[in-house]
Amino acid sequence: MQIQKNDRKFIEELYYETNPYKICDIFDSKSKMYNDAKLIHFNLGTNPYLEPFKNKILNGYSILGVSDYEKSYVFDNKYNSKENRVLEIGKTINLDLNVLTYLKNIVADRKLEDEQNFINYLKYIKESKYNLNMSISLLERISKPIDLKVWSDYVLSLVKYETLENITKDSLKDDKILPEPKYIWAKEILDSSEYMDEKFDQFYVVACILSKAFILKTQKMDSKRKFLELLNYSLNELNIYLEFELYLMHKYLYNDESVERAFAKIQGISKKILGNIKNTAWDILHIRLVEEQMINDLKKGKVIFHYIGTKDIGLQKIVNINPLKIIGFLDEQKIIVRDHNFKEEIQCEEIDEMLEKHINKNNIGNVNYKEKFEKISTEVAKII
């Protein structure tokens, strides 16, 4: 859904204003035009009460949010923004497939190289009262087909971990039967895999943009022209504008050192490049899914900060490159705004014209992104 002009102006005012009191005034006056408007602003100064919500990395294992949650302020058009109110805030950690694999191996009493550090990580999550989620692993599981019996072991390992009060190696590998409600929950998780099929369009879109950027990076033209070609492909071939991904690819095409580690998998030509492009697309989708969960929670009247649990350094780097500044919704319009966008770094009339033309499009038809990815994959294969 393209953001409407009035919505865009409202969000831009919030984005560019630096005075917290003026931000409150802007929200209170402009949000009256909506039936329901909730936004979280992540740049209004550190709140000492939100110290427990800070990002952490423990011996390489992360609890990373998509912004600095300790600097957040929750806006709701049903309340005066300057008045004190009590808010219940939850925190959920989304464990990636690698972390779940380590957990499954410990439960199955298999050797784990970094065993004690990992158990300490699991203990910290439990003691700090994070809710557990494996949505991003469900997503990964679809991309890397796993036998149903093996996948059931993953799910039961997570459910067992959630059930335990005391986390030790012995308690994790103990064969104790779980309470019946926990088995019901495990079945619900297994059944929810079907919902994740809907996310495949998002995967193919991101994979297409990464593939096109990789192709352009191998060509002899200046970085600005490469980015213009990528933007044109995104807007006119894929019929979509993804600011986060385009910002990342702008850095990638300009050989920016800040993204070198994050995109190490797609920095050079290799026989594994298509697989590496897919893996990087999944990394980016982890972030997208976490953001979507936060918005869905807000729509239900809940404020829940979501984190990614991973040991993947590339994913950790991507999460930190361009954190959220504002997230939420204005009626049915989702709002996701980050600290930076590529328009701050590359001023060009051609870009402005391309974006304006895209915004004013009326006849946006359906695009088969799977076919688009298959097509561009053949172009990537020719380079190898």
Feature names for model-found ranges:
Residues 308-310:
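Acidic beta-strand-to-loop metal/phosphate-binding motif
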